[in-house]
Each structure stands twice: as structure tokens, then as C-alpha cells.
A protein has these predicted regions:
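Glycine-rich, basic loop-to-helix element that forms the pyrophosphate-binding segment
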Residues: 67-83
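Acidic helix N-cap motif at the loop->helix transition within catalytic regions
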Residues: 21, 46-54, 66, 78, ...
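Short beta-strand/loop segment that forms part of the nucleotide-sugar
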Residues: 34-43, 63-68, 92-93
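N-proximal low-complexity "stem/linker" segments adjacent to membrane-targeting elements
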Residues: 1-29
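Short aromatic/hydrophobic "clamp" motif used to bind/position activated sugar donors
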Residues: 88
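A conserved acidic beta->alpha catalytic loop
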Residues: 26, 41-50
Length: 160
């Protein structure tokens, strides 16, 4: 697969010392090669700002934005301002993604009818066992905008 098109992965960071390393490592290990990871420190009072700086020192694909706390949407918007990718992926800092997620997204975007790509979400117990698989949207199906909204309403699936 060609890696010409860059994906910007924006990660708002706030009070996630325990989860941040797993999240960032899942992003840096992507099989799709042309990514930038934008960690937006949203004024986190713990060690997250220093952790973000260390990730940037270790990998030049990592950009850091340090800002005053403004909430999730404000942090995402701050990341979007410095993003240089043609596509944007938002990942919450207490989450992680499969190693081939970006590659699969890029393959899915080859369908000329695609405006948005929705990934699956699985809740995990502290012991690592799967708790709930959140996706009722069927894989590999192209929905119209109206069909997607109807499906999301039926499944009670709305994500920030």
C-alpha cells in the first residue's frame, strides 16, 4: 500500500497517566506508514504533559500541543489547527486501536461514496476481557447519510 496520504491522529490528553502509553503505542505501531500523532495536553495536572513531551522526543511523528484546560471539543479543535494530514482520526487517550486500523480506513476510503468511516468500539474489563461490543453498524456496508443516522438512532449509538 502506498503511504502518500497523511493521516493526522488527534488525541486529547487529560488525567490518563495509566492509559496513555498503551494508547500512543497503538498509534505509533500502525502498519500504515504516513501518520502524525497529535497529543493535545488539555492542562492535565498529572504527569501527562511530561509523558507527551517524552513521546515527541522519541518519535518525530508526534506533535504536542500544551494548552489550558478547555474540555474535549476544545482539545480536538486545538489538534485540528496543527494537523497536516488529509484525513483526521480522533482517538480518546484512554483507548487504543488495532495495529492495522489506519490501513483499513485508507482501504475503505477508496469507495468513492464514502464521507465518513466509523470504527468499532469494544469495552474491556480491567482483566482484559471483552465486556460489550458497541457496533451495531455492519462492517463493509455503505449507508446513505439518512440510513446511517437511522441505524445509529436504532442502535442508540452516539459518540463524542
Amino acid at each position: 500500500m502506498e503511504f502518500e496520504i497523511k493521516i493526522s491522529i488527534i488525541v486529547p490528553v487529560y488525567k490518563v497517566e495509566r492509559e496513555l502509553n498503551r494508547c500512543v503505542q497503538s498509534l505509533l505501531r500502525q502498519t500504515y506508514g504516513n501518520i502524525e500523532v497529535i497529543l493535545v495536553d488539555d492542562g492535565s495536572p498529572d504527569c501527562c504533559p511530561e509523558m507527551c513531551d517524552e513521546f515527541a522526543r522519541q518519535d518525530n511523528r508526534v506533535k504536542i500541543v500544551h494548552k489550558r484546560n478547555g474540555g474535549l471539543s476544545d482539545a480536538r479543535n486545538a489538534g485540528l489547527k496543527v494537523a497536516s494530514g488529509e484525513y483526521v482520526l480522533y482517538v480518546d487517550s484512554d483507548d487504543y486501536i488495532d495495529i492495522d486500523s489506519c490501513e483499513r480506513f485508507m482501504e475503505a476510503r477508496n469507495n468513492e461514496n464514502v464521507d465518513i468511516i466509523v470504527g468499532n468500539a469494544v469495552m474491556e474489563k480491567k482483566d482484559g476481557n471483552e465486556l460489550i461490543n458497541h457496533s451495531e453498524i455492519q462492517e463493509g456496508i455503505t449507508y446513505t447519510s439518512k440510513e446511517f443516522v437511522e441505524q445509529a438512532i436504532k442502535a442508540n449509538q452516539w459518540y463524542a
